[in-house]
């Protein structure tokens, strides 16, 4: 039987890569008449080039605005008032540092974190890292899809139940696939619109609430932390660094066509990615600040503060601030829907890179996206059916999901910091001793904070001899694997990467 000309095999013959060459945004050639492509001198700044590089940072910033972060914001505002705004600022700065290192890894090597983990670690360790990354992604995806489903329920006046909202949200996978066929810039434009919707809706709420400007600035400038607000402080930091986002950003930066063998081109890409990532996270900080201050103004010091959560936040806002020209309940619902939809799509995107990178799956992208979406949507549907009528149970589940993601953070941060520190991997773009020390201090701080969250949670939730034994056994294996990853980081990676030096023609 003759093979049809339009037939597309499910398996690709070449090795898995983040983007095919025909999918990348062309950078080489812009202002080429004024640049000496092989020079070691950094080309002059160009607004046109900044525009061409703009996109990956905004996709990355979605993880700072997902429903899990919004819940952390509203609880911090309701319970701690304005006092944790300084921590939100510094947590965002720490998140920016981690994401810039992730981008640096992707630009300098031409490969993303999942690929490098597969190549540089033994097979067994690589598989453990993959499983941990997938678990973190599934946990994040459940929160994101449930957040969208809650928003749909709000906007439909309760007519659409959670399970139906989950089904509707699951269809965004196919919208994402459709958009990607028209180019990565179209997809990035959609995310820009969704971020704009969040900025407008939460900014509208901020304007309606009229929070105290003096208390706001004092909260940002003066560090303050009491024993009563430690849990909210841990939540603020814990929500900022998402394991799957570290993998995602190192892949997103490869959507631009640059010559990785020319030092000036790599330096130029790093400069523009640093500018656009910083801009994106400044915007995300402002949006998170809007949410925190609205709930600080409305609920701090009230009896409702300890009971507020993502499920009932809209109704509490409506009761506090009233209807007005456009009811604040629906403004909140629209912003929450934009947050849930955008983060769900980026979760699907991250799932493709994680699965493809660790397993070297040479599948067509639509099939890989379908597989990753199915892995996440099935447990989410079960959650929606079980917890549809129980708000308290849904909040407890959310705590467990936060714990699940906190457990995974070292398995993204440690490989990243080890890889960007090695000349065998990064060549001349390895991080220097000062940046290395700062990065490890940030990573240690994040892991200690999340460790506190885990200990506090397990002391309160783990009961019974059998359950305690299982948790202790898991903890021992967990700590041992972290020690292995750190110790390996002080040895040379040499399985697949001989000493790499950037050549300048």
Swiss-Prot record:
Keyword Transmembrane: yes
Membrane topology: Multi-pass membrane protein
Transmembrane segments: 50-70, 78-98, 127-147, 159-179, 187-207, 233-253, 280-300, 321-341, 369-389, 400-420, 439-459, 466-486
Statement: the UniProt record of this protein carries the keyword Cell membrane: no
Catalytic activity field: Mn(2+)(in) = Mn(2+)(out); Fe(2+)(in) = Fe(2+)(out)
Main location: membrane
Keywords for this protein: Ion transport, Membrane, Transmembrane, Transmembrane helix, Transport, Vacuole
UniProt note on tissues of expression: Expressed in roots, stems, buds and leaves.
NCBIfam families: nramp, Nramp_1
The family this protein is said to belong to: Belongs to the NRAMP (TC 2.A.55) family.
Function, as annotated: Divalent metal transporter. Can transport manganese (Mn) and iron (Fe). Involved in the release of metals stored in the vacuole.
Name of protein: Metal transporter Nramp3.2
């Amino acid at each position: 039987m003759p093979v049809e000309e339009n037939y597309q095999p499910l398996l690709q013959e070449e090795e898995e890569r983040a983007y095919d060459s025909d999918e990348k945004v062309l950078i080489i050639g812009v202002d080429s008449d004024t640049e000496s492509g092989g020079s070691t001198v950094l080309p002059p700044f160009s607004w046109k080039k900044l525009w061409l590089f703009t996109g990956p940072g905004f996709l990355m910033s979605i993880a700072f605005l997902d429903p899990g972060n919004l819940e952390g914001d509203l609880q911090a505002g309701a319970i701690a008032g304005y006092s944790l705004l300084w921590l939100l600022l510094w947590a965002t700065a720490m998140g920016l540092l981690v994401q810039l290192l992730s981008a640096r890894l992707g630009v300098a090597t031409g490969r993303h974190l999942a690929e490098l983990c597969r190549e540089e670690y033994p097979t067994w360790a690589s598989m453990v890292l993959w499983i941990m990354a997938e678990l973190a992604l599934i946990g994040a995806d459940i929160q994101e899809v449930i957040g969208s489903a809650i928003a749909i329920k709000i906007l439909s006046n309760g007519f659409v139940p959670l399970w139906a909202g989950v089904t509707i949200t699951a269809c965004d996978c196919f919208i994402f696939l459709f958009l990607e066929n028209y180019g990565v810039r179209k997809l990035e434009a959609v995310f820009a619109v969704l971020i704009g919707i969040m900025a407008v809706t939460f900014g509208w709420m901020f304007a309606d609430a009229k929070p105290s400007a003096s208390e706001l600035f004092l909260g940002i400038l003066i560090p303050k932390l009491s024993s009563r607000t430690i849990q909210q402080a841990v939540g603020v930091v814990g929500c900022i660094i998402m394991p799957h986002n570290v993998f995602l950003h190192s892949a997103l930066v490869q959507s631009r066509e640059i010559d990785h063998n020319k030092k000036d081109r790599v330096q130029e890409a790093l400069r523009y990615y640093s500018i656009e990532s910083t801009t994106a996270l400044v915007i995300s900080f402002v949006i998170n600040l809007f949410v925190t201050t609205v709930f600080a103004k409305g609920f701090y010091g009230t009896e409702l503060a300890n009971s507020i959560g993502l499920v009932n936040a809209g109704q509490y806002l409506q009761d506090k601030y009233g209807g007005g020209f456009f009811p604040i309940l629906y403004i909140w619902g629209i912003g929450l829907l934009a947050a849930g939809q955008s983060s769900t799509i980026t979760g699907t995107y991250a799932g493709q890179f994680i699965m493809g990178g660790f397993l070297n799956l040479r599948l067509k992208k639509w099939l890989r996206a379908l597989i990753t979406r199915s892995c996440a949507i099935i447990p989410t549907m079960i959650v929606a059916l079980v917890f549809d009528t129980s708000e308290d149970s849904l909040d407890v589940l959310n705590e467990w999901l936060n714990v699940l993601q906190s457990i995974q953070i070292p398995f993204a941060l440690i490989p990243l910091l080890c890889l960007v520190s090695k000349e065998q991997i990064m060549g001349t773009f390895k991080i220097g001793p000062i940046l290395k020390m700062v990065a490890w201090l940030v990573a240690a701080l994040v892991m200690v904070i999340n460790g506190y969250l885990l200990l506090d949670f397990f002391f309160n939730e783990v009961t019974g001899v059998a359950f305690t034994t299982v948790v202790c056994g898991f903890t021992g294996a967990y700590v041992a694997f972290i020690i292995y990853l750190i110790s390996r980081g002080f040895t040379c990676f040499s399985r697949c990467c001989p000493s790499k030096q950037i050549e300048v023609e």
